[in-house]
Swiss-Prot record:
Compartment list: Cytoplasm; Mitochondrion
Posttranslational modification: Phosphorylated by TBK1. Phosphorylation inhibits the translocation into the mitochondrion upon Sendai viral infection.
Gene3D superfamilies cross-referenced by the UniProt entry: L-arginine/glycine Amidinotransferase, Chain A
Entry EC no(s): 3.-.-.-
Name of the protein in its database record: Putative hydrolase DDAH2
InterPro entries documented for this protein: DDAH-like
Gene for this chain: Ddah2
Chief place where the protein resides: cytoplasm
Amino acid sequence: MGTPGEGLGRCSHALIRGVPESLASGEGAGAGLPALDLAKAQREHGVLGGKLRQRLGLQLLELPPEESLPLGPLLGDTAVIQGDTALITRPWSPARRPEVDGVRKALQDLGLRIVEMGDENATLDGTDVLFTGREFFVGLSKWTNHRGAEIVADTFRDFAVSTVPVSGASHLRGLCGMGGPRTVVAGSSEAAQKAVRAMAALTDHPYASLTLPDDAASDCLFLRPGLPGTTPFLLHRGGGDLPNSQEALQKLSDVTLVPVSCSELEKVGAGLSSLCLVLSTRPHC
């Protein structure tokens, strides 16, 4: 038997989707979203892909940009992946639901078992789902409802699944994330701290907690692409984006910190974990 939580972050592949020109205008990105600097957004996205491929050594698969899917680069909302199973989500926004099609095919081609939502009353954004290595927490938010959370529980029956209220327009992973198999990192806002308190009340597992000045800094990815026993990585927002949180992140001494920027993509709602899907095609990972 492995150590509880040891499966957290095991990965061999990463999936991203290119940034389309339609994201550069507020109209293309959707009602209420600001215009952004397309070239800067594409540079940020390119650097992220380079870090995943070169620094972490992952097999990188990049779906081409689609002008009809301005928010297509936020493909972390389109699937929840654990082990060899991928739950294809039903995003809250009807305009975003076609985004799942290309992701579904890519994950099928990688040999994952595909599970569909199959309920028109359910909504689920993937960035409302936090996997700790031991259990799932699903944020009940503007984007994800109870029925969506129930389908997560039905899909991943080997794990406990608990729901956490999320206020405002945030996703759960925009408030908290995993800094390691036993460490929850969370922002300092009342919404983030409320979510962490709710998680602590619901779990049977002890987690350490690290508070970061910026909520967005907690949207990080703990990744173990190497063999067991090798030092894991923490992909996180760097000092150019969130300088106030860098000192606190240094307290995570058991990981190699890999900073990236997504300050331009953040303008249209992108958090770091929304910009990629990571998975393992290796057995027993």
